[in-house]
Structure formats: structure tokens, C-alpha cells
Amino acid sequence: MRIIPAIDIIEGKCVRLSKGDYDTKIIYNENPLEVAKSFEAYGIEYLHLVDLDGAKSSKIVNYKILEQIATQTSLKIDFGGGLKSDDDLRIAFESGANQITGGSIAVKNRTIFEKWISEYGSEKIILGADAKDEKIAVSGWLEESNEDLVPFIQDYQNKGIQYVICTDIAKDGMLQGPSFDLYSKILAEAKGVKLIASGGISTFDELPKLAELGCEGTIIGKAIYEGRITLKQLENYIIG
């Protein structure tokens, strides 16, 4: 299972929020590149990089940080947050993203998101399915939609999506453990999906459980920054 640490960016700094609420922001490091290099030093290969300024302003903002991390580490980066236009996407890939995650755009502008899937392919485009009570949430989680989570994922599988990052918003940044039941349900009903679990990871022991369920990967944020899971533990897990 892929281990994917997260770096969330506000005003160029590495932060974490609780339940996606911008008022709860804690700054963990002024230098995201340093954080990324520390991940790489422990054998980590993947990075989930979120432009929270972008998510709020509906256009790419922190692409310079993406570029720095992409040029100065060999991490495979999936980048998300506010990608709304062909231009945003071009900038993200030109700045060094290996994959991009589309969340709000997949709800609010299906035409453009489906075009991206067909143009760039399913290895490059990840569906961000962020849910609250099994309804999809959009715009940095500030709005709920009427889309039901599992049918939404299935619909995009039919359009060619393979990778799905699913965040249970109620769990995100709360360090109370991930939504095992929700992920079991998705894996049972959206057959063949490459599911990346996100939100709530709080202890190392949860990782083998997510792997057992069949998750393709897991995104870990606050648990690393708060020292609940150490980079050494992750290194040992990756080495196997």
C-alpha cells in the first residue's frame, strides 16, 4: 500500500486544518520544501500536496512550491486545490505534478473534468471524493452537494477514472481513526477502484488494516506532524 504524506499549503507555509475549517489552521513549518525533503530522506516516494489558497480562490496559487518540491526531490506528487481550468492544469503539470486531484470541478463542471480524463488519462487524473455523511462536499468543503458518494465514484469509473482519494470530512484532522466502514463499502460497491484513504489516520496500527481492506494507498497528515506516527515507522513499513 502506498504511504502518502500530505503537505497542505496556506500562504506558502505547511499547515493542517481540522475538518477543513480554515479557522483551525495550525502552522507546522514555514518551509514546505524542508518537510518534503525530510519525507524523502525516510524512503517515502509519494506526496499529496494541497493548495488550500487555491481551493479557496478557485484557481492555482501555490504552484511555485510545487515546482520547488518537484525539482529538488524525486517525490511523485499528486497536486490538488482549486484546479478549475485547462490553464490551471497545464501550470500544475508544467510545475512538476505527476498527478492532479480534481474534487469540486468533478461536481461543478463535469464536462471539463471528463475532458481532462480523456486527454491526460486515468494515471494522471485522480478523483477527489470528499464526503460528509456520504454526500460529496465541494469548494474546500465549504459546501455540500446532492451527490451521493458511491454512485458518484461509480459514475466516474464508467468515464475511465481509476484512482479515487476519499476523505471523510468528519474525520479529517481529528486523529480519531479512519472510516473503515465507509472504505469497505466503497471497495465492495465500486469494483476495481484504486482507493486512497484520507482523513483521521491517527496510529501506525491503522495502516495494515487499511491495506487489508484493499486500499491502494493512504494519505497521512496530522498524525505525522503531531508525532503520532514517526517517519521511522513509515520507513520500516515501506521496506516491509
UniProtKB/Swiss-Prot annotation:
Keywords for the protein's UniProt record, in alphabetical order: Amino-acid biosynthesis, Cytoplasm, Histidine biosynthesis, Isomerase
EC number: 5.3.1.16
GO CC term (a single one): cytoplasm
InterPro entries assigned: Aldolase_TIM (IPR013785), His_biosynth (IPR006062), HisA_bact_arch (IPR006063), Isoase_HisA-like (IPR044524), Isoase_HisA-like_bact (IPR023016), RibuloseP-bd_barrel (IPR011060)
Catalyzed reactions: 1-(5-phospho-beta-D-ribosyl)-5-[(5-phospho-beta-D-ribosylamino)methylideneamino]imidazole-4-carboxamide = 5-[(5-phospho-1-deoxy-D-ribulos-1-ylimino)methylamino]-1-(5-phospho-beta-D-ribosyl)imidazole-4-carboxamide
Record-level GO BP terms: L-histidine biosynthetic process; L-tryptophan biosynthetic process
One Pfam match: His_biosynth
Catalytic-site annotation from UniProt: 8 (proton acceptor), 130 (proton donor)
Pathway membership: Amino-acid biosynthesis; L-histidine biosynthesis; L-histidine from 5-phospho-alpha-D-ribose 1-diphosphate: step 4/9
Subcellular localization: Cytoplasm
Keyword Nucleus included in the entry's annotation: no
Top enzyme class: isomerase
Keyword Transport: no
PANTHER family membership: 1-(5-PHOSPHORIBOSYL)-5-[(5-PHOSPHORIBOSYLAMINO)METHYLIDENEAMINO] IMIDAZOLE-4-CARBOXAMIDE ISOMERASE
Protein name: 1-(5-phosphoribosyl)-5-[(5-phosphoribosylamino)methylideneamino] imidazole-4-carboxamide isomerase
Native species: Flavobacterium johnsoniae (strain ATCC 17061 / DSM 2064 / JCM 8514 / BCRC 14874 / CCUG 350202 / NBRC 14942 / NCIMB 11054 / UW101)
Encoding gene (name): hisA
